[in-house]
Amino acid sequence: MRLAAENLSGERGGETVFSGVSFALGQSETLLVTGPNGAGKSTLLRIIAGLLPVAKGHVAFSGGGEIFPDAGAACHYLGHLNGMKPALSIEENLVFWRDFLGEERLSPLEALEIVGLGEIAHLPFGYLSTGQRRRTAIARLLVSYRPVWLLDEPTAGLDRASEAQFAEVMRAHLSAGGIIVAATHLPLGLEGTQELKMGAGN
C-alpha cells in the first residue's frame, strides 16, 4: 500500500493556508506533521480524508484493492472532536461506529480493554473524563479496520500512562503494515518517523 500527496495546496475560508506539500508513505511508515497553529496541519489531514476539497495537486492511495479504492475509503480520521454521543454508553458508541464503518476488526469490549476502559464500558460517554473520552475515540480505531490512520493531536487530554499505551496501539498498527499521518505538537513515542514541517515555505 502507498499513500502519497503531490504539490498539494489547501484552502480555508477561501484563503490558501499551505501549498506545495508532497510526501510518499509505504506500509509501516509514519509522517509527523508539525508546525505552528494556523499552518494548515488539520486542513491537510481533512483533505487526505476527503472531508475537504483539494485546492491544487492530488492525493493518491494505491494497493487497497476493491475494499479501499482511494484515500478517503482507506482512512480512519481522529480529529479534535471525539465523535461520540454523550447519552450512549461507551460500548454502544463503539457498536455504532463498528456497524457504520464495517470491516470489523475487534469487538467493542476487546478494543476497550486495550485502552484500559473495559471495566466501565457500560457508563454513558458523557460521564467520562477528558482523558477517558479520548481513549474511547482511540478505541474506535480498533473496532473497524482501516490501513491509514489520520490523527489530529491524538494525545490531547491523555496522561503519561495513556500516551505510552497509545504508542503501543500505534506500533501494533504499523507492525501490521498500517500507515499513520499525525498532526502533533508532542512526541508520540514512535521510532523512524518522517516529518513534514508546515509553515516552512509551504
UniProtKB/Swiss-Prot annotation:
GO terms for cellular component: plasma membrane. One of its GO terms (molecular function) is ATP binding. It catalyses: heme b(in) + ATP + H2O = heme b(out) + ADP + phosphate + H(+). Pfam families: ABC_tran. It is found in: Cell inner membrane. GO terms for biological process: cytochrome complex assembly. It is an enzyme of class 7 (translocase). Its main location: membrane. Gene3D superfamilies: P-loop containing nucleotide triphosphate hydrolases. Its EC number is 7.6.2.5. SMART domains: AAA. The complex is composed of two ATP-binding proteins (CcmA) and two transmembrane proteins (CcmB). This is Cytochrome c biogenesis ATP-binding export protein CcmA. It comes from Chelativorans sp. (strain BNC1). The lineage of its organism: Bacteria, Pseudomonadati, Pseudomonadota, Alphaproteobacteria, Hyphomicrobiales. The gene is ccmA.
